[in-house]
Amino acid sequence: MAPSVTLPLTTAILAIARLVAAQQPGTSTPEVHPKLTTYKCTKSGGCVAQDTSVVLDWNYRWMHDANYNSCTVNGGVNTTLCPDEATCGKNCFIEGVDYAASGVTTSGSSLTMNQYMPSSSGGYSSVSPRLYLLDSDGEYVMLKLNGQELSFDVDLSALPCGENGSLYLSQMDENGGANQYNTAGANYGSGYCDAQCPVQTWRNGTLNTSHQGFCCNEMDILEGNSRANALTPHSCTATACDSAGCGFNPYGSGYKSYYGPGDTVDTSKTFTIITQFNTDNGSPSGNLVSITRKYQQNGVDIPSAQPGGDTISSCPSASAYGGLATMGKALSSGMVLVFSIWNDNSQYMNWLDSGNAGPCSSTEGNPSNILANNPNTHVVFSNIRWGDIGSTTNSTAPPPPPASSTTFSTTRRSSTTSSSPSCTQTHWGQCGGIGYSGCKTCTSGTTCQYSNDYYSQCL
């Protein structure tokens, strides 16, 4: 079977329909973006559904010439086919993708992303997709969130230590850097940048013959798994960024029983994340002065981890890059919503969920462990909403606690006295491990299963 006919980089996007119609049955891979309904909200008008979809990143695609010779090789481009931008644009075609095989499925307002997919040769392959939110015209949705809020539901229960389910904002161009040699642009996932200044084969849609990094402001709304999470702004100048950022991680801030399976934010179940970008005058025209994180679960507001709220109001590491004011300007001009799932072969994601950052051991996040024990690891994002602060969720105060309990505790719960009967851990909750002193009896229908010396879980 011949490879599919695809979009030439120099062919207008409007020609896509004609190219698809000319393809032979069973031989083509057209670019069909999975629909993902999102919502734009106002206090006066409520939330209105948006006609949006997702598109897979440009670098995940096959590029080839008319004879199906690859235009890319390990470490860059085929210099015979791509000696310069104009020749590359003339010679090379870019494929559409099979989204389901790439670990991406959508249903209504819900997006599921898998780390691994079954391989045709047996076993599993790491697909680790990265996606961008696209409008009905084939350009990126530009979220202008200064003085606004962003809310979404997320299910991280299937993400173990070492996995990172991410939802963040990147200051990419609306058209993905489309130009005369790359008319595919955003419609094919072009133009990625972030605060790590990645060096890619294409830089904002242009062949990167000078091997420059591509820096831009990055606002990490969520980097997390079922054990830890972080909220982190990364401000940039044109050529450099605050790559480390100044984030808030509940565990890293000392609130070690706030976030996790069975904890205050119970990651064994779906929950809602609300992120508010507060300005000095309370409107989108003001200067960004703080970023606030809130949670809901089962429609009920969850108390913040920190007294006074989980808020980032200063960013010393970003002072050389303009601090929060720079991020506010990026949020005002518009940023692209990015979704990803990934793991880390070198550092095992320890910066996110191990040591001072989380409860995971230094080796739990090894991708070989993840694949062996959690080949179906995935994240689900749903009900993505943005708009006026206070417009994207229905807030309900938490019920009053029983007389014998407190509203919030910074230490893991245990039985109240040494003579009390054993407490019962919930499904997915921790039930054993070195240093663990909490509930060791699992709820009915589950048993305490060993994962490693530091962690056993009710399954």
Curated annotation (Swiss-Prot):
Keywords annotated in UniProt: Carbohydrate metabolism, Cellulose degradation, Disulfide bond, Glycoprotein, Glycosidase, Hydrolase, Polysaccharide degradation, Pyrrolidone carboxylic acid, Secreted, Signal
Chain spans, region Catalytic: 23-397
Active-site residues from the entry: E218 (nucleophile), E223 (proton donor/acceptor)
SUPFAM superfamilies named in the record: Cellulose-binding domain (SSF57180), Concanavalin A-like lectins/glucanases (SSF49899)
Residues glycosylated per entry: N78, N204, N394
Annotated region (Linker), positions in chain: 398-423
Spans annotated as Disordered: 390-425
Enzyme class: hydrolase
Location of the CBM1 domain: 423-459
Reaction it catalyzes: Endohydrolysis of (1->4)-beta-D-glucosidic linkages in cellulose, lichenin and cereal beta-D-glucans
EC code(s) of this entry: 3.2.1.4
Compositionally skewed regions (Low complexity) per UniProt: 404-425
Keyword Disulfide bond: yes
Keyword Signal recorded: yes
Modified residue annotations for Pyrrolidone carboxylic acid: Q23
Gene Ontology MF term list: cellulase activity; cellulose binding
Domain notes: The enzyme consists of two functional domains, a catalytic core joined to a carbohydrate-binding domain (CBM) by a serine-, threonine-, and proline-rich, highly glycosylated linker sequence.
Task of the protein: Endoglucanase (EG) that cleaves the internal beta-1,4-glucosidic bonds in cellulose. The degradation of cellulose involves an interplay between different cellulolytic enzymes. Hydrolysis starts with EGs, which cut internal glycosidic linkages to reduce the polymerization degree of the substrate and creates new chain ends for exocellobiohydrolases (CBHs). The CBH release the disaccharide cellobiose from the non-reducing end of the cellulose polymer chain. Finally, beta-1,4-glucosidases hydrolyze the cellobiose and other short cello-oligosaccharides into glucose units.
The protein's name: Endoglucanase EG-1
Classification of source organism: Eukaryota, Fungi, Dikarya, Ascomycota, Pezizomycotina
Gene name linked to the record: egl1
